[in-house]
């Protein structure tokens, strides 16, 4: 807390706004009102910091370092980047390019309407506990696919889900998104990536095996396979 709000001290050398979103996390700011120069600038400022992982209420900024430009097998240039809150308009055209069958395989059932309430669940993301990477066509800006990773409460396992446009299968897009997600997971302390895949989704199961996932039948639901990848193998 600031010791005296009325003190006309300048904190030019201390970027308080940035300290709210970037590590280290400012926990306490103290200003000694007795130690100031003639123009009222405080010269004795103390800041107590704690590591990001232990700072409650920490807001993680957009992770720009995870942006990448690459290409599909046919040479189509794509841009893979973390999801942003303003990306909702990209989703409706994207879902219109996904068949009902592929929607069912992704959500384990039909989706009647991709309205704002439905899409909001995907757009509102906390980078501390979840991540979503979207692939965009460099030429048109259209959304081509998305992979998500949610950290489980234990902090060391995470669950993934992926969906790409139905007309882009077998062009390497799913592989690129999965690899991006797999590379990202250990940087967040996730040691095991988990997922549930319908047994009939042979394309996804084949890719999981090629990526090194262990694939086993769900002991509770025979229609589902459980997939698991240990990130410490890489």
Question: Which residues does each predicted region cover?
Answer:
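Long, contiguous binding/interaction regions
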Residues: 2-3, 10-11, 39-234
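N-terminal intrinsically disordered, low-complexity tails
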Residues: 8-31, 36
């Amino acid at each position: 807390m600031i010791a005296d709000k009325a003190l006309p001290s300048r904190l030019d050398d201390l970027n308080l706004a940035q300290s709210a979103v970037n590590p280290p996390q400012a926990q306490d700011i103290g200003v000694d009102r007795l130690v100031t120069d003639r123009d009222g600038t405080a010269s004795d400022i103390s800041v107590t910091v704690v590591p990001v992982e232990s700072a409650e209420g920490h807001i993680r900024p957009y992770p720009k370092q995870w942006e990448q430009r690459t290409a599909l097998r046919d040479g189509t240039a794509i841009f893979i980047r973390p999801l942003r809150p303003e990306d909702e308009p990209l989703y409706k055209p994207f879902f219109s390019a996904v068949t009902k069958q592929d929607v069912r395989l992704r959500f384990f059932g039909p989706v009647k309407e991709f309205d704002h309430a439905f899409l909001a669940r995907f757009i509102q993301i906390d980078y501390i506990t979840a991540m979503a990477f979207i692939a965009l066509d460099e030429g048109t800006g259209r959304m081509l696919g998305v992979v998500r990773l949610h950290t489980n409460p234990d902090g060391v396992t995470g669950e993934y889900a992926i969906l790409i446009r139905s007309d882009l299968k077998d062009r390497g897009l799913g592989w690129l998104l999965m690899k991006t997600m797999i590379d990202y997971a250990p940087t967040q302390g996730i040691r095991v990536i988990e997922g549930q895949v319908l047994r009939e989704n042979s394309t996804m199961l084949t890719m999981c095996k090629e990526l090194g996932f262990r694939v086993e039948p769900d002991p509770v639901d025979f229609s589902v396979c459980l997939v698991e990848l240990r990130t410490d193998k890489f």
